[in-house]
């Protein structure tokens, strides 16, 4: 999971300038994302036990959501992409990467609620989430449904596979690194 998230973030960093993209890395796993803290794109790196920093991050993102909603309303545009086409000063895309989402429940109800609202409202505002988890039920269903694209690696329980990508003719591969991907409603094997 950590290697997958690392690959996603490095790929985004390679294809986007710092002026256009920032990362907020929430490393709730084994601290495997620490090296990404050196990327110029990384605005902040937060580990699981840094509760004060996490609280400040939540406040910062909530304020940014309000600011972006106001900017889009002033320009009378429906989303981040259209805003950046018409605005003189464009907005940066923000990617919030969460490794080991399973532990969010330990952070409390407020954290779960924050991520639910973020996953619902963020995409249209240019604030995107990428999260990893070991179980399909680690994330509330209402939050999970806000993710349009889903990737399932090897899972111990095959029924988790169907929860993540839906029913398909593909089955889980025993080969390490193989995944099932649900992208734009289609399921494929990688």
State the predicted function of each range:
Residues 1-78, 85-174, 180-188:
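P-loop NTPase catalytic phosphate-binding loop
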């Amino acid at each position: 999971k950590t290697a997958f998230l690392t690959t996603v973030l490095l790929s985004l960093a390679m294809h986007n300038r710092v002026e256009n993209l920032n990362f907020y890395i929430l490393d709730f796993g084994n601290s495997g994302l620490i090296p990404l803290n050196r990327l110029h794109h990384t605005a902040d790196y937060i580990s699981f036990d840094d509760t004060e920093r996490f609280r400040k991050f939540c406040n910062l993102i909530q304020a940014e959501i309000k600011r972006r909603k106001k900017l889009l309303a002033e320009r009378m545009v429906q989303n981040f992409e259209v805003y950046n086409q018409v605005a003189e000063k464009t907005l940066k895309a923000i990617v919030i990467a969460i490794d080991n989402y399973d532990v969010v429940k330990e952070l409390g109800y407020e954290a779960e609620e924050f991520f639910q609202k973020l996953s619902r409202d963020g995409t249209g505002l240019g604030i995107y989430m990428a999260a990893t988890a070991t179980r399909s039920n680690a994330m509330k269903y209402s939050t999970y449904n806000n993710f349009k694209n889903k990737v399932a690696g090897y899972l111990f329980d095959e029924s988790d596979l169907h929860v993540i990508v839906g029913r398909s003719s593909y089955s889980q591969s025993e080969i390490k690194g193989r995944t099932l991907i649900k992208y734009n409603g289609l399921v494929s094997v990688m």
